[in-house]
């Protein structure tokens, strides 16, 4: 009966008041459900960049953790993906059984980067075959389809940016000049240095969502994409409130990730899970797949099994359940 939701109407970096949280709880409860996990409390670009209003935003984030805890909500998902958060190129990809799902195609994303975003040097990230296919794809789109394609990438999927235009994305990208993976990891550590003590005080957990897709995009570093990233993160901030939202869909989209190995190695840090399966193709594209399917020989029934084991363990002074959401 539990659900994952967020207060999407509140601007990034602002405080979630007890009143707003309670109002959403009441709405959820009116359907016989319980809001027990936040997905997500967004981390502002200022925090990721440690510029502008980042100090105020961090203080507001701490207060939001306190206010959520006061309302009994202690599972908090967040991500540290720069600029565009989650990325897909097709929000209505049709499967053979007639159902629809989400898809990422590197050729289509190349068309976005090169012809719409016009990112300098984007061509260097693609093969000649991909560049030729991207040009052909872009030329196949008329004006309306081009605009719809642009919006599907920058303003529709879960990392909704509330009406950004392509020029805004260019300005956001420019702010990351000189920010490499090492520096972004330092910014994540400094953010966690501030918020984890508050989470510990109230028995809350901060669960980072893996990068989706789990590889660099737009020339930007992604720092929660592979096992070594999480090893570094937990070593830098060993607090028991520092956890992962183990998203099988995001992680499996990177063929460098060994999902069973990561599940076994990180199980002490897994407090929340997204049980999704992904079909990865040789051309680098991937799409959502039914969760009863197999990926690379991995039986996803092992994840609920690990969930049951986790429920038997005591963490932060009490038993905690590993949460799951419907596939998406």
Label the model's feature ranges.
Residues 29, 46-51, 55-61, 66-76, ...:
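Histidine-acidic metal/acid-base catalytic patches
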Residues 7, 37-39, 77-82, 210:
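Glycine-rich, histidine-containing beta strand-loop boundary motifs that form or position
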Residues 6-22, 218:
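Glycine-rich, proline-tolerant flexible connector loops at the mouths of alpha/beta enzymes
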Residues 33-48:
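A short glycine/small-residue-enriched secondary-structure motif
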Residues 77-100, 105:
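Long, hydrophobic, well-ordered secondary-structure blocks that form the structural core
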Residues 102-125:
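A gly/proline- and charged-residue-enriched helix-loop-helix capping module
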């Amino acid at each position: 009966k539990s659900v994952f939701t967020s207060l999407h109407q509140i601007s990034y970096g602002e405080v979630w008041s007890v009143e707003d949280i309670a109002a959403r709880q009441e709405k959820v409860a009116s359907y016989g459900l319980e809001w027990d996990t936040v997905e997500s409390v967004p981390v502002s670009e200022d925090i990721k960049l440690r510029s502008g209003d980042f100090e105020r935003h961090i203080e507001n984030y701490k207060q939001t953790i306190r206010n959520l805890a006061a309302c009994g909500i202690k599972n908090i998902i967040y991500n540290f993906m720069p600029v565009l958060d989650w990325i897909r190129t097709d929000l209505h990809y049709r499967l053979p059984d007639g159902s629809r799902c989400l898809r990422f195609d590197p050729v289509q994303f190349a068309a976005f980067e090169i012809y719409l975003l016009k990112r300098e040097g984007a061509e260097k990230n693609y093969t000649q075959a991909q560049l030729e296919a991207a040009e052909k794809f872009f030329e196949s789109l008329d004006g309306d389809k081009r605009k719809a394609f642009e919006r599907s990438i920058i303003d529709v999927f879960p990392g909704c940016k509330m009406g950004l235009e392509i020029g805004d994305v260019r300005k956001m990208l420019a702010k990351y000049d000189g920010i490499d993976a090492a520096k972004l990891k330092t910014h994540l550590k400094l953010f966690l240095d501030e918020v984890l003590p508050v989470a510990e005080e109230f028995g809350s957990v901060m669960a980072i969502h893996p990068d989706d897709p789990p590889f660099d995009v737009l020339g930007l570093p992604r720092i929660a994409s592979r096992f070594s990233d999480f090893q570094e993160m937990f070593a830098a901030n060993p607090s028991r409130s520092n956890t992962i939202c183990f998203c099988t869909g995001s992680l499996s989209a990177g063929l460098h990730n060994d999902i069973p190995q990561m599940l076994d190695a990180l199980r002490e840090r897994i407090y929340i899970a997204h049980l999704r399966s992904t079909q990865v193709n040789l051309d680098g594209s991937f799409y959502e797949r039914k969760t009863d399917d197999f990926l690379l020989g991995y039986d996803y029934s092992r994840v609920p099994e690990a969930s049951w084991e986790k429920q038997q363990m005591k963490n932060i002074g009490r038993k905690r359940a590993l949460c799951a959401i419907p596939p998406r």
